[in-house]
């Protein structure tokens, strides 16, 4: 019997019904009653089956809860045991401390008999009496200074107190105002000082930038001078080779004129080296070239010549060195050491060439004396170039 089928009605029969009703009707009522009983039994069985499963689940849950509660109980019992043990330990410690803190009669007697403790108690007693006396005196003074609102002394004292309070407030304002003014003045000074520092820093930055530009210019000038010096040395080496090839016992004036032309070329290169990257006028280059024609030449050791010409050259070079060697060395070295800019190098070289032209004699333009002069002048030129290179290296 399913839950969807309606439950049959319960049949109720009394004793009168049994007596009055017919047999067929009684059988029908009995069948209805049996159907009702069967429906109830089916429902009961269904309920019993559901209740059994639910009871089993609930039983398992209860068992788990019982186990969990038993475990918790054990844990709590252990905690309780530990707490009780701790409490016992605490009680024992408390009893021990009480016993320690409660001195015995013997200890009390020993403390009372101790002279140091007796002295300490006597001092405490004296100080207590002094404080009591001071307290009484202060109370008496306080009671003497008490006054009523109508007393003149109280009014005067209150007025004096108000006046003192006002004076204190005014003094505080003055002090605060003076401090603020001082701080403002210091702040203005600091601002002015910071502005001056800023301006000086800007000037220094501009000066440093200018110095960097000048250093770059000097470096480019030095590079050009080094290149020109290298070219000049190469030309001097070529000139020495030509001189060594051309110097022979059968030399004539024609062969001596060729070195003069080569010396002019060398002097032009030297003047260009001294002038640096600046493009000077042709007249200045000619002037400096004539000056270097008398000075710039190769060293004396690189000139192989005959004995006669060598003696003449050595005599003329000694005479030239004795008369104006110092005048050659100082102007030339000074001229090369003063190469700070293209304009300065051009002016110094022009001045040096004018001095050298004015110091020469017309008789020194001879072939033999010219060779000696070129020898000495080449030494001076090399010394001046080396000194100028050293000076520029120190500048870098």
UniProtKB/Swiss-Prot annotation:
Polar residues: compositionally biased ranges: 340-351, 380-396
Residue list for modification N-acetylmethionine:
1
- State if Coiled coil is listed as a keyword: no
GO CC terms in record: cytoplasm; nuclear speck; nucleoplasm; nucleus; RNA N6-methyladenosine methyltransferase complex
Top-level taxon of the source organism: Eukaryota
State the name under which the record lists this protein. Answer: Pre-mRNA-splicing regulator WTAP
Assembly and partners are described as:
Component of the WMM complex, a N6-methyltransferase complex composed of a catalytic subcomplex, named MAC, and of an associated subcomplex, named MACOM. The MAC subcomplex is composed of METTL3 and METTL14. The MACOM subcomplex is composed of WTAP, ZC3H13, CBLL1/HAKAI, VIRMA, and, in some cases of RBM15 (RBM15 or RBM15B). Interacts with WT1. Also a component of a MACOM-like complex, named WTAP complex, composed of WTAP, ZC3H13, CBLL1, VIRMA, RBM15, BCLAF1 and THRAP3. Interacts with CPNE4 (via VWFA domain).
Identify its protein family. Answer: Belongs to the fl(2)d family.
Point out residues bearing the modification Phosphothreonine.
350
Question: Which keywords does this Swiss-Prot/TrEMBL entry list?
Answer: Acetylation, Cell cycle, Cytoplasm, Developmental protein, mRNA processing, mRNA splicing, Nucleus, Phosphoprotein
The gene it comes from is Wtap
Q: From which lineage does this chain's organism come?
A: Eukaryota, Metazoa, Chordata, Craniata, Vertebrata
The effect of disrupting this gene, in the record's words, is: Death at E6.5 due to defects in cell proliferation.
Localized where?
Nucleus speckle; Nucleus, Nucleoplasm; Cytoplasm
Q: Name one Pfam family in it.
A: Wtap
């Amino acid at each position: 019997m399913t839950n969807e089928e309606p439950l049959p009605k319960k049949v109720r029969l009394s004793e009168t019904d049994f007596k009055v009703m017919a047999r067929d009707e009684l059988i029908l009522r009995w069948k209805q009653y049996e159907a009702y009983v069967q429906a109830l039994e089916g429902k009961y069985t269904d309920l019993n089956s559901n209740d059994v499963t639910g009871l089993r689940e609930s039983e398992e849950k209860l068992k788990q809860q019982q186990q969990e509660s038993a475990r918790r109980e054990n844990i709590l019992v252990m905690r309780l045991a530990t707490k009780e043990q701790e409490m016992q330990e605490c009680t024992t410690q408390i009893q021990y401390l009480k016993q320690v803190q409660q001195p015995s009669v013997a200890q009390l007697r020993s403390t009372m008999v101790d002279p140091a403790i007796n002295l300490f108690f006597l001092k405490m007693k004296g100080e207590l009496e002094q404080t009591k006396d001071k307290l009484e005196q202060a109370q008496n003074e306080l009671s003497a200074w008490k006054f009523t609102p109508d007393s003149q002394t109280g009014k005067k004292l209150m007025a004096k107190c108000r006046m003192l309070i006002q004076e204190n407030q005014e003094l505080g304002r003055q002090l605060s105002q003076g401090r603020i003014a001082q701080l403002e003045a210091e702040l203005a000074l600091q601002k002015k000082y910071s502005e001056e520092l800023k301006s000086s820093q800007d000037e220094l930055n501009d000066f440093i930038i200018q110095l960097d530009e000048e250093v770059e210019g000097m470096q480019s000038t030095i590079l050009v001078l080094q290149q020109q010096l290298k070219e000049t040395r190469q030309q001097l080496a070529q000139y020495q080779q030509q001189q060594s090839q051309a110097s022979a016992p059968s030399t004539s004036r024609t062969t001596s004129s060729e070195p003069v032309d080569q010396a002019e070329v060398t002097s032009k290169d030297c003047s260009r080296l001294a002038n640096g990257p600046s493009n000077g006028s042709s007249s200045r280059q000619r002037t400096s070239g004539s000056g270097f024609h008398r000075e710039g030449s190769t060293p004396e050791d690189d000139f192989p010549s005959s004995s006669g010409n060598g003696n003449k050259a050595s005599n003329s070079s000694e005479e030239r060195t004795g008369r104006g060697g110092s005048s050659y060395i100082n102007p030339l070295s000074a001229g090369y050491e003063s190469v700070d800019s293209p304009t300065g190098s051009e002016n110094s070289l022009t001045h040096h060439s004018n001095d050298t032209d004015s110091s020469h004699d017309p008789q020194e333009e001879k072939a033999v004396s010219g060779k000696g002069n070129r020898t000495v002048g080449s030494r001076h030129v090399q010394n001046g170039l080396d000194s100028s290179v050293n000076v520029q290296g120190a500048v870098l």
